[in-house]
Amino acid sequence: MSRLAVELPGLSMKNPIMPASGCFGFGKEFAGFYDLNHLGAIAIKATTVEPRFGNPTPRVAETHSGMLNAIGLQNPGLNNVIDNELARLADVDVPIVANIAGSTVNDYVEVAEAISRVDNVHALELNISCPNVKEGGIAFGTVPDVAAQLTQEVKRVSTVPVYVKLSPNVSDIVEMAQAVERAGADGLSMINTLLGMRLDLKRRTPILANGTGGLSGPAIKPVAIRMIYQVSQAVSIPIIGMGGIQSADDVLEFMLAGADAVAVGTANFTDPYVCPTIIDELPKRMDELGIERIADIVGGSWKQS
């Protein structure tokens, strides 16, 4: 086994690096830059039952050390994703993680049941940051019992492992992680974006048409590290860590905190080569730090104390 290889439920990865959902389209957008087979896995853009056109513009705003986005889960819908987007990735020899979203539990179940049966889908990533229209618009990921019920229903129909993507916009992320673990989650991905806002000084209104948006990029990295450090000590399922990763050192820091693999998000927008660059840099940094196998350092920051 390669010194960079990691094994997670449903995901045999040649290295621990995957592009994060929502920052890589459906993969083909980056195929002109480098060979996608270089990646450890690919997490595709969120898929919903019906096509979604997303929020009105502006949907993106720059911030110091990051960005705000309120895209609104724009995607071509379940059937199109299966027939076209996933079909285009059929020749890519890399595990595919399908991110799924919805407005009701039934929406999630319908997408999960269909997309998990596609041959090249190896795992699902459950986006629980979506508003639950049956519960007054409260996000699925802010109430442990609601998140657990959703996880349980998706697990019931999925033929592949299910990773629950946790929102940081909660009072106790450990409680949330434990709730979805009890409900059958095979793994976690964390963290999703932090809720934020920017104002236009001339118009005296929010820059984003949606008002608020998700903050991502290096600005949220310390929050992600802290949450992964806490959660990894409280659950027994693997974690895909994300939140501001842009270098090999960032990857090693996330894994020392307790992540078993990582996803690179916002950095793809500023450097489309960031993922293969990190992969190529990792062995050198591991040599410098005396690390033989990358999987051996997972949780090293707390396992040694």
Curated annotation (Swiss-Prot):
Cofactor note: Binds 1 FMN per subunit.
Coiled-coil blocks: none
Signal peptide (residue range): none
Subcellular location: Cytoplasm
Origin organism lineage: Bacteria, Bacillati, Bacillota, Bacilli, Bacillales
Protein purpose: Catalyzes the conversion of dihydroorotate to orotate with NAD(+) as electron acceptor.
Catalysed reaction equations from the record: (S)-dihydroorotate + NAD(+) = orotate + NADH + H(+)
GO CC, any one term: cytoplasm
GO terms of molecular function: dihydroorotate dehydrogenase (NAD+) activity
Cofactor or coenzyme needed: FMN
GO biological process: 'de novo' pyrimidine nucleobase biosynthetic process; 'de novo' UMP biosynthetic process
Gene that encodes the chain: pyrD
Protein name: Dihydroorotate dehydrogenase B (NAD(+)), catalytic subunit
Pathway(s) annotated for this protein in UniProt: Pyrimidine metabolism; UMP biosynthesis via de novo pathway; orotate from (S)-dihydroorotate (NAD(+) route): step 1/1
